[in-house]
Amino acid sequence: MDQQVRVLWSRLLHLRSSAAALAAAPGILVVAERHSRLVRLDPQTGVPLWEQNVEDCWGTTVVAGDRCLYLSQAGVLHCFDVHSGQRTWSTPKLCLCHYIIVAGSVAFLSGWRGYRPLIRVDLTSGELFPGQLPGSAPGGSLAWPLPVRLDPERSYTAGAVLLASASEAALLLVDALTGVTRGEWSLPEPVRFPDSGVAFSAGEDGRIVFLSGRRTVMVLHPASGVEILWRHDRDLRSLPPILSGRTLWLTEDTGVTTIDLDRSSRTAVMHLPPGATGEGVPVSGDALFARAGNQLIAVNRAGEIAARVRLPARIDRLLPDGRSLVHAIGKGHLTTIDISTTPT
């Protein structure tokens, strides 16, 4: 099978929005732009569907079911109906928060690099839950929390969240409603993550892959615990590995390596364009990586470049929509790419 990577459309955001100001779900795309607008766009065409005024375009956007949340840099958390754009509630005085994830009926907020402890907000009312969660003491660098589906056989996501700190060699799974610890796992070294805080890559089968230290790739399945998948022979970039089936994609400073876990064999991707490799995302059984020079490359399981395309601006973040689209935001541009697979 061959990958086809095609640019569908590109939109000028007029200001350099935060990379976290973009959120996507199947059939849904929302971005903060033009200093003070939150806009829902048609993912296929880029046509605006609704817009609302917010405080800035440097905050964090999340889509969760029928809700869209926007946490402004000014410290106001807004909740909108994702279909109509109607504002449901707004909660102020949440300064120094940056991370948002939703688990069940609860939104988790935390400060970038742990500048503010993890807090919980009721999605129905916007009210804060009392108390402080375990593992959320201020002063420690916290990875972006991850909602965890405890029962992959069910269609809904159970209300639990995975926590990791740059200073503790452990993972913590916390119940969203009660704050009670549901699981705790020791690691060889603390979870390693970049300045953005994104540490985990979650697969559809419930496996969560991450770096423990600079060279060890590990996987967590909440039902069975953690295990070491691969020990690399040199330092990896502080970016989440990608795991699909029994294939790993690892990001090094200037290159990409694929690992066949069944054979314990590795393949360095050849003929890469010059420059650094950025984050990657899984696409149709392969992996898509941002490269210096505004380039995207699709790398297959054999370690071959299956497709490449150049975008209008530098790529700060890639965000799949859960179907065949990938959205790229960076340097004042939003670009949507269609990833299709064709028989060879």
Predicted features along the sequence, with ranges:
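Secretory-pathway ectodomains
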Residues: 1-344
